Amino acid sequence: MAALCRGTVRACILKPLGLSVSLQVKRNVRALRRTPVRVLPAAEKGRERKEVEARRPQQPRQSEYQTRTSQGVRQASALTEAPALEFRYERALPGDKRLSKVVTIAKSKKFRDRHGQVLLEGRRLLTDALESGAVLQTLFFSRVDYLKLFPPDKLRKANLIKVNFDNIKIWSDVVAPQGLMGIFAKPDHEKISYPTTQTKHTLPLSLICDNIRDPGNLGTILRCAAGAGCNKVLLTKGCVDAWEPKVLRAGMGAHFRLPVISSLDWDIVPNYLSAGTKVFLADNFRPDMKHKTGDVSEKASDYGWVSTNPRRILITEEGYESSSDEEDNADKLYIPGLEVQSYFESWAQSPCAIVIGGETHGLSIESLLLAEKSNGKRLYIPVVPDIDSLNSAMAASILLFEGKRQIENTMKRKS
């Protein structure tokens, strides 16, 4: 009531001033109309709260023993994952330089020859290597799930190291690395277990690489040789190392599908060829070049993929004849004359070997001498005039699959 009186007096005082006070009066009136609320003591309030909680459904609480038991089960399940994989691995800590050190050294040919180790990257190469019997020494991986991709018995004796994917990406030569890098003992072609499907389709066809120095070309040539069913690939001294990482990537596992024998002298090349094998040369010589003379340039294609010392050469159908003023010298170059024929003519009716020369240095004189000794020929692939020689990998693929076709047709006629 006192509040109402104060509001009325205030309204009377402010009314002459022209101010509105209806809102204040109504507020006080509403305050008088409220129903009183019973005030509960603290004890009664606590008793009502307990009654409400008593009416709620009770949920069983885990005892301390049950809590410890459940934690033990979770820990046991985490520990059983390692025995399920049947091998242990270690996690590389930040600052671990084992990956960078091993990868850097393994990319060196001197290290590969001295320590007998090679670097393989990617699931495909690792799988082919393990299936062929290659010995895995160290495996770097970025995810534990990757270990399930390989047979457990092949990983038991290896050193397994889990590293960050960013580290693999830094040291990988691949644009999109898969997170797998392995260090293997350098495989021996005599101890490798080649796939049964590969050996079943092997033909009496060999490939000799002479001065192939481009890693991509050599890898592609090895892949073509495996696809054509060659029984072996011989690499003479001067070729790029077959276990170079770029060669391995371009080969797509061909190293583990057929014997690849490296660093051979021409004197021992015939020891790796079966008796009666004819040697044919992939040559850029064309019959329409008869009696054309010119200075020998550094391009092998200018004189039929045959690399010689710079001097003038007379190119004829019978062969390459030197017209140098130094003919009377003791070191006069002898280039054997070999018959030339088109690659699609009949030439692969018996065991044969094809020699592919590099694009820069071409065929060596030793290859011509070997072909002459085995009654071989020069095989040329017709191309449009004034076009440079074909890529060595392309020429190899054309001749290999043509040889495969002719050998298979001969075998069908005999059967």
Curated annotation (Swiss-Prot):
GO terms for cellular component: mitochondrion. It comes from Xenopus tropicalis (Western clawed frog). Residues 59-73 have a biased composition (Polar residues). Residues 44-56 have a biased composition (Basic and acidic residues). Belongs to the class IV-like SAM-binding methyltransferase superfamily. RNA methyltransferase TrmH family. It is an enzyme of class 2 (transferase). This is rRNA methyltransferase 3, mitochondrial. S-adenosyl-L-methionine-dependent 2'-O-ribose methyltransferase that catalyzes the formation of 2'-O-methylguanosine at position 1370 (Gm1370) in the mitochondrial large subunit ribosomal RNA (mtLSU rRNA), a conserved modification in the peptidyl transferase domain of the mtLSU rRNA. Also required for formation of 2'-O-methyluridine at position 1369 (Um1369) mediated by MRM2. The gene is mrm3.
